[in-house]
UniProtKB/Swiss-Prot annotation:
Binds 1 FMN per subunit. Binds 1 heme b (iron(II)-protoporphyrin IX) group per subunit. It comes from the Bacteria. It holds the Pfam family Ferric_reduct. Keywords: Cell inner membrane, Cell membrane, Electron transport, Flavoprotein, FMN, Heme, Iron, Membrane, Metal-binding, Transmembrane, Transmembrane helix, Transport. PANTHER family: PROTEIN-METHIONINE-SULFOXIDE REDUCTASE HEME-BINDING SUBUNIT MSRQ (PTHR36964:SF1). The chain crosses the membrane at residues 10-30, 82-102, 116-136, 153-173. Disulfide bonds: none annotated. It is a multi-pass membrane protein. The gene is msrQ. GO terms for biological process: protein repair. It is found in: Cell inner membrane. This is Protein-methionine-sulfoxide reductase heme-binding subunit MsrQ.
Length: 199
């Protein structure tokens, strides 16, 4: 049984809640002692992991729609991508304002260049910014065939973002490895498409 347009609308509502509720939880945790002795790192890791979750969900949509024969699922991809960008922006903001501090924002550029894992992070964010700004139907019409080429760059983010996470942790734990493995698996599902590009 295929999903209807009405069911997709309700699914989008649920996905919006999935994007917004973690923010409410984070505010609650900040104000009610729900974070560890290093709350800045907790906020950075939470926002970064949430961005990664939405990135993986975005990458999951196409193969899921294809294998489950639910073409209307594609309509949720843009929404998931937007939430990925929102959480990636919160992640970047938490580093800039909480780690560096508002009085040291001038150091942000040098920090992003001098620390390789930060360089990967800002490249990923800039790509997400470009994809977000061109995610409208107007941009799709204006860019034509170039639109799909541009939005295929999301696969670069799928590589760089997990590496950024792996590189940023001082002690390797299962979480970043799991995210990297999931990203790799989702990229592997597109093996045939990549082969066509390389020919």
């Amino acid at each position: 049984m295929r999903l209807t347009a009405k069911q997709i609308t309700w699914l989008k509502v649920c996905l919006h809640l999935a994007g917004f509720l973690p923010l409410l939880w984070l505010f609650w945790a900040i104000n009610h002692g729900g974070l560890s002795a290093d709350p800045v790192k907790d906020i950075q890791h939470f926002t970064g992991r949430t961005a990664l979750k939405f990135l993986l969900a975005t990458l999951l949509v196409s193969p899921l729609a294809r294998y489950a024969k639910q073409p209307l699922l594609i309509r949720t991809r843009r929404l998931l991508g937007l939430w990925c960008f929102v959480w990636a922006t919160l992640h970047l903001t938490s580093y800039a304002l909480l780690e560096l501090g508002i009085h040291n924002l001038a150091l942000l550029g040098s920090e992003l260049i001098s620390r390789p894992y930060l360089t990967l992070g800002i490249i990923s964010w800039l790509v997400l910014l470009a994809l977000t700004l061109t995610s409208t139907q107007f941009a799709q019409r204006k860019l034509g065939k170039r639109w799909q080429t541009l939005h295929n760059v999301v696969y670069l983010v799928a590589i760089l973002a997990p590496i950024h996470y792996l590189w940023s942790v001082k002690i390797l734990s299962p979480q970043p490895v799991i995210y990297a493995a999931l990203a790799l698996a989702l990229l592997a599902l597109r093996y045939r498409r990549f082969r066509q590009w390389w020919r």
